[in-house]
């Protein structure tokens, strides 16, 4: 386990992973100053409870979250500009929209602790064709065309697609995609065939897992393109109002907030 600023150096993490010097590496996803408070809290907990056994924290969805009433209050505020429906299975509906080629804003549960969007404050699309990468960079994120996106993959399929020997739940290991899988996920593969992989485990993020799993049932590809819910120069969307305003202003086709699905009028 290691952290601080070096912890977000994906290619260094990938080299350490590939070296096989360790059975497993763990990088705290809020590496840097933000993680100091988290680390001191753990040290205090260990000292005060006399905990002997090492433990690993796997849930880093520690930020703000909103209940259905709070979400609906925001929806009603913008009802002249949006249509919204309550979906019994938002993950299944979202997967179908993505498979049809739509760009989806995905705002769920508690916000991520750290700089990466890990499936609760994300913009999501299908990982193919290659032109999807260019479209999202140019029309949604307003970034340079070479900038890569992350493949979010069902954890049990990760070794089929990537040269990974462990989970990568916090999108902090750069690894290569296998040659026979590149054609299925070209929008998430960097020019050097590397990927910033996020493995998704149902026990950690059930709704995001269900979205990808439903996408897999439709397309037979267990991977979606995942990028942070923001545009260049802006912070990640933190509350429903932020998400709705971003959705209305930019080329995002649909927005899922909790179990509500939004479309522009």
Where are these regions (language model features)?
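Short glycine-rich phosphate-binding loop at a beta-alpha junction
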Residues: 1-5
């Amino acid at each position: 386990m290691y952290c601080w600023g070096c912890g977000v150096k994906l290619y260094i993490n990938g080299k350490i992973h590939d070296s096989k010097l360790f059975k497993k590496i763990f990088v705290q996803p809020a590496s840097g100053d933000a993680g100091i408070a988290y680390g001191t809290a753990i040290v205090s907990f260990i000292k005060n409870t006399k905990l002997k056994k090492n433990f690993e924290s796997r849930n880093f969805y520690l930020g703000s979250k909103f209940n259905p009433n709070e979400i609906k209050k925001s929806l009603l505020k913008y009802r002249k500009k949006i249509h919204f429906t309550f979906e019994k299975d938002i993950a299944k509906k979202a997967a179908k929209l993505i498979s049809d080629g739509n760009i989806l804003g995905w705002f769920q549960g508690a916000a991520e602790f750290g700089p990466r969007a890990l499936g609760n404050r994300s913009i999501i699309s299908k990982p193919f064709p290659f032109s999807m990468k260019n479209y999202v960079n140019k029309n949604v994120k307003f970034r340079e065309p070479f900038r890569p996106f992350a493949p979010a993959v069902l954890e049990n399929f990760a070794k089929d697609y990537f040269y990974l020997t462990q989970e990568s739940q916090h999108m902090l290991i750069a690894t290569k995609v296998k040659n026979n899988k590149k054609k299925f996920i070209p929008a998430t593969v960097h020019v050097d065939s590397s990927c910033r992989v996020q493995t998704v485990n149902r026990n950690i993020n059930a709704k995001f897992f269900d979205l990808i799993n439903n996408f897999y049932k439709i397309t037979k590809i267990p991977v979606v393109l995942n990028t942070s819910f923001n545009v260049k120069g802006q912070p990640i969307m933190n509350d429903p109002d932020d998400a709705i305003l971003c959705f209305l202003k930019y080329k995002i086709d649909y927005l899922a907030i909790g179990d509500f699905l939004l479309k522009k009028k």
